[in-house]
UniProtKB/Swiss-Prot annotation:
This is Uncharacterized hydrolase YcgS. PANTHER family: BLL5160 PROTEIN, HYDROLASE, ALPHA/BETA FOLD FAMILY PROTEIN. The lineage of its organism: Bacteria, Bacillati, Bacillota, Bacilli, Bacillales. Its EC number is 3.-.-.-. It comes from Bacillus subtilis (strain 168). Belongs to the AB hydrolase superfamily.
């Protein structure tokens, strides 16, 4: 995928970002372990005349971790990015652990946000220090360990793509692999391999773990733009209560429950439906 990758510096902090496609601007808040090279769902949007701006969130890629001292501070930098690009307002798509960033941005800068789409998104406190996943995340996905973890995953995935998909996909789903197999698309294996090749945690995932509780009811209730919430009923990473929580507290929000095989709603036999629902929302 052709994209322009650059950085801007403001108040001593560096923000890395990419721009791909030409047309109506969309600002994407990527999920955990990702960066400005994210590409899930991008092709369909670009083909329909959208330009996608993806900042590496704090601690990911070349973006300074200091920018992420709070969600509000990070959002100041996203505003500066739009100013730098001379963009008045954008559609915002917030994915998974990027949910809190999208919610904060839409609630604090309503004049800059045309619509907000939450995809498999965290919308309230997620993992806590009491959770096994939190403890494992702190050990495995902190520098410098995370670098070697992702190198190992990437190497294994490149060598044994089908085996790794079979081993790892159930972590993203509440379904056993045999059910996933019936819902998957053959292209999912390559998309999954590419995902694992581009992922790194940097300092970003630890920041994500520490900030999910920072999303308040006040933030959700302050959002005034049209909102679409998309999540699979089989999501194994983010509980469905997050989607229902957002629906309950954001005025006029539309909840769309999907039947894709898990957290990665851009994969599987339902992927085309995911794309068409999003495009229909953006164009309405």
């Amino acid at each position: 995928m052709k994209r322009r990758v650059e950085t801007i510096t403001f108040d001593g902090g560096t923000l890395e970002y990419s721009v791909t496609g030409k047309g109506t601007p969309i600002l994407v808040m990527h999920g955990g372990h990702s960066n400005c090279y994210e590409e899930f769902g991008y092709t369909a949007l670009i083909e329909q005349g959208y330009s996608i701006i993806t900042p590496s969130r704090p601690g990911y890629g070349r973006t300074s971790k200091e920018i992420g001292k709070s969600l509000a501070n990070a959002c100041r930098f996203y505003v500066k990015l739009l100013d730098h690009l001379q963009i008045e307002s954008v559609h915002v798509i917030a994915i998974s652990a990027g949910g809190p960033s999208g919610i904060c941005f839409a609630s604090h800068y309503p004049e800059r946000v045309n619509t907000l789409t939450l995809q498999s998104a965290v919308t309230k406190e997620w993992l806590t220090p009491k959770d096994t996943e939190y403890k494992l995340g702190e050990i495995l996905f902190r520098p410098p360990v995370e670098k070697w973890i992702w190198k190992l995953i990437s190497s294994l995935n490149n060598a044994f793509p089908r085996l790794m998909f079979r081993a790892m996909s159930p972590q993203f789903s509440t379904l056993p692999f045999q059910r996933i197999k019936s819902l998957m698309n053959e292209k999912d294996i390559e998309a999954f391999r590419k995902m694992n090749s581009r992922q790194r945690s940097g300092e970003g995932f630890l920041i994500d773990l520490s900030q999910t509780a920072a999303v308040s009811l006040k933030d959700l209730q302050a959002i005034i733009c049209p909102v679409l919430i998309m999540q699979s009923v089989y999501d194994g990473l983010v509980d469905l209560s997050h989607a229902h929580h957002a629906k309950e507290h954001i005025r006029g929000a539309v909840l769309c429950l999907l039947h894709s095989w898990g957290h990665l709603i851009w994969l599987g036999k339902e992927a085309a439906e995911t794309g068409s629902i999003l495009l229909g929302f953006l164009e309405s």
